[in-house]
Amino acid sequence: MQTRITSLRHARTAIRILAACVVAAMMLPTIGACTSPRIAGRAESEHQVSECEIAYRSATAGDERARTAPLLERYLAVSSSAQAWQTVAAICPQRLSEGIIRSAQAQWNAQNIADSLSTTYTASTADGNALRRQRLDGVTSLPLDNTTLRHLALAEDRAGSAMQLLAAKNAPGATLTLSDNHHAAGSQLMTLAGNNGDLRQKEYDVSALIANPSTATDHNTGLTAASAAIVEMDCTLEELAALSAAGQAPATGDAATRTQQMLTVIRLVTGHCYQAFANGYPSGDFAVFASTSKQ
């Protein structure tokens, strides 16, 4: 009899333990529900989208439309994209080279589409709002340190001397106007640098140009292109390297003013990149981004 009572007690104890476990398991979701729930989209909404991200999204969206839209819409898209990529270059330091090259590509595409539509692409006008510049007339300040300005001046002067030689040899794409513009930009940049520590040289090694005034092998890509096109691309890459390593001058004025000043430099370099395309340098990513990767 005692054994039977003991067995019943053990059974009841086991049942109580099992019941307690079941209740505890049922309460776990309720306990979890008492913690702060994650509101869908909360983290996303708390992320502050930067001006750089907004500009980059706008530029890439324009590129996408340019790939898929009908011809007229493509023209409008690449025209808009050209401006958007310059904004990216101005406010996203880590995307400066990409922004300049993409803008030049977009402008070159716009020019080609304009030709197909028998219209005129006007981004090359000489006013301060143009997307391309060849010189810095009227510019009195740039948000760059003097060392960077001196290296930009050297690149312009080197290109000017090379273009002068090619123009004298009647090389395709080479003109004295291009040479004069490069030399003028170099002088203007040195003036902005205070005319101290001038890196420009009276003579440059032009033996390769003398031997190959019409076409040459681009040392950056191994591709054959017009010598005048390679001169413009070399100038572009030299200036991109200088800007990528640039320090900023002491802040003077508001951020909007500095952005506008930076756009002036960006449009100068964009102009050289575009001119390289116009002279026959390949405008595809396989060429231009292979070149920048070696800088």
Model-predicted regions and their roles:
Residues Q2-R4, C34-Q295:
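All-alpha RGS (Regulator of G-protein Signaling) helical domain and cognate RGS-like helical scaffolds
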Residues M1-C34:
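Sec-dependent bacterial lipoprotein signal peptides
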